Amino acid sequence: MAKNKFNQSWLHDHINDPYVKMAQREGYRARAAYKLKEIDDQDKLIQPGQVIVDLGAAPGSWSQYARNKLAASPRAKDGRIDGAVVAIDILPMEPVADVTFIQGDFREEEVFRQLEQVVLDASGGSRIDLVISDMAPNLSGVASADAARIEYLCDLALDFAQAHLKPEGSLLVKCFHGSGYSQIVEKFKRQFKVVASRKPKASRDKSSETFILGRYLKSVD
C-alpha cells in the first residue's frame, strides 16, 4: 500500500512538474535539458563552433539542447550546425538531428577507439571543447556502495576530459551530495584551474543531485 501511494505521489508530481510540461511543449525528451540550459545560461559553456561530447547521453535531452544551441549560431548555414555533438551511451537512443551517436560502453577498448575516431573526425584532429556527463549509477541505498559508484563514473569523465579536452576546455558532470562528494571536488581541483558546483532550479528539491563544473585544464607535470 505504501509503495502504491509513493508511486501515485511521484506520478502526480511528475505530471504537474512545470519542467516536464515545458519539455513536452518544446520537444525535449526529458526535463534534464533545463538543468543543462540553466548552467549554460550562467556559465556560457556552449559556444559556436565547439565540439561537444555527451557521456551517458540517453535519452538525449542534453544532446538535443547542445545541438539546438549550435544550430542557433549565425554561422550555421545550409541546415548544418556550427560545431559538432558526439553522444555515447550503453543504452539505445533515438536519433537526434546532427548528433553522432555511439551505442556502447566506452570502457571497452573497441568502443573507446570508435569514440576517439569520431571525435577526431569531428574536431579535424584537434581536441574537444566541452565534455558533459549526466551519467548516474543505479543507486542501491547503501551509502558506501553508492558513493563508490558515483565516484567511479566521475573518474571516467575526468580521465576522458584530461585526455581529450583543449587547455581552455570544460567538463560538467552530475554528482550527488553525500559520502565521497568532497573527494570528487578535490579531484576536479587537481585537474582544473576553476571548479564550481551548480544546483539548477530544474533539479528536484528532494534530490541530492548537483553538478560539478571544471574549466581550464591544469598542465600535466
From Swiss-Prot:
Protein purpose: Specifically methylates the uridine in position 2552 of 23S rRNA at the 2'-O position of the ribose in the fully assembled 50S ribosomal subunit.
GO molecular-function term, one example from the UniProt record: rRNA (uridine-2'-O-)-methyltransferase activity
This protein's name: Ribosomal RNA large subunit methyltransferase E
InterPro entries (UniProt xref): RNA_methyltr_RlmE, RNA_MeTrfase_FtsJ_dom, rRNA-MeTfrase_E, SAM-dependent_MTases_sf
Source species of the chain: Cupriavidus metallidurans (strain ATCC 43123 / DSM 2839 / NBRC 102507 / CH34) (Ralstonia metallidurans)
EC numbers for this chain: 2.1.1.166
CC annotations in GO: cytoplasm
Pfam families reported for this sequence: FtsJ
HAMAP family per UniProt: RNA_methyltr_E
Compartments where located: Cytoplasm
The gene coding this protein: rlmE
Residues binding S-adenosyl-L-methionine, per UniProt: 60, 62, 89, 105, 134
UniProt catalytic activity: uridine(2552) in 23S rRNA + S-adenosyl-L-methionine = 2'-O-methyluridine(2552) in 23S rRNA + S-adenosyl-L-homocysteine + H(+)
Location, primary (coarse class): cytoplasm
Keywords of the record: Cytoplasm, Methyltransferase, rRNA processing, S-adenosyl-L-methionine, Transferase
Lineage: Bacteria, Pseudomonadati, Pseudomonadota, Betaproteobacteria, Burkholderiales
Family: Belongs to the class I-like SAM-binding methyltransferase superfamily. RNA methyltransferase RlmE family.
Enzyme class: transferase
Gene3D superfamilies: Vaccinia Virus protein VP39 (3.40.50.150)
Record-annotated active site: 174
